[in-house]
């Protein structure tokens, strides 16, 4: 999504009040989803932040059923509480079974958990046990 942060009038329930995916972001989501499908890789579960751009990414990736999870929300501008969000996410990590879970979230959340710096169109493989992170870019 182009820009920086979300507008002052941000509302989690109103996509028009949020920074959303542009054509490039939509194309990136579709391309990443297509590459994953082509590889034959499957996720046990797919979780998305409640922000509209993350939910749209989940839809455009077209990898199957997904659900929102507030533990992936952005705390960059204080729209979500950082400590609470990270507690929820770390607690969810403890519930993960065997297999791989796809998390669709924000740069600030990814960096806080993995220590990795990511840009638009990049994604991170993160091992919740070893705490190892690897950044990937499709192009």
Show which residues each predicted segment covers.
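Short, surface-exposed amphipathic charged segments that create phosphate/polyanion-binding patches used
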Residues: 80-87
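Beta-strand elements within well-structured catalytic alpha/beta cores of enzymes
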Residues: 47-48, 99-105, 109
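Membrane-proximal amphipathic alpha-helices
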Residues: 90-91
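A short, structured loop/turn motif at beta-sheet edges
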Residues: 94-99, 128-130
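Short active-site-adjacent structural elements
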Residues: 111-113
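Active-site-proximal alpha-helix that buttresses catalytic centers in soluble enzyme cores
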Residues: 1-79, 116-139
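Generic detector of bulky aromatic hydrophobic side chains
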Residues: 15-16, 94, 107
């Amino acid at each position: 999504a182009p820009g920086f942060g979300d507008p002052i009038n941000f509302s989690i329930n109103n996509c028009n009040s949020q920074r959303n995916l542009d054509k490039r972001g939509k194309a990136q989501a579709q391309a990443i989803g297509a590459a994953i499908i082509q590889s034959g890789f499957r996720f046990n579960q797919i979780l998305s932040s409640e922000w509209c751009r993350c939910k749209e990414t989940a839809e455009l990736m077209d990898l199957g059923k997904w659900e929102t999870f507030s533990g992936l929300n952005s705390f960059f501008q204080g729209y979500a509480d950082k400590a609470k969000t990270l507690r929820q996410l770390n607690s969810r990590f403890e519930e993960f079974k065997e297999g791989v879970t796809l998390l669709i979230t924000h740069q600030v959340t990814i960096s806080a958990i993995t220590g990795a710096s990511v840009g638009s169109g990049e994604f991170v493989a993160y091992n919740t046990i070893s705490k190892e992170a690897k950044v990937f870019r499709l192009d």
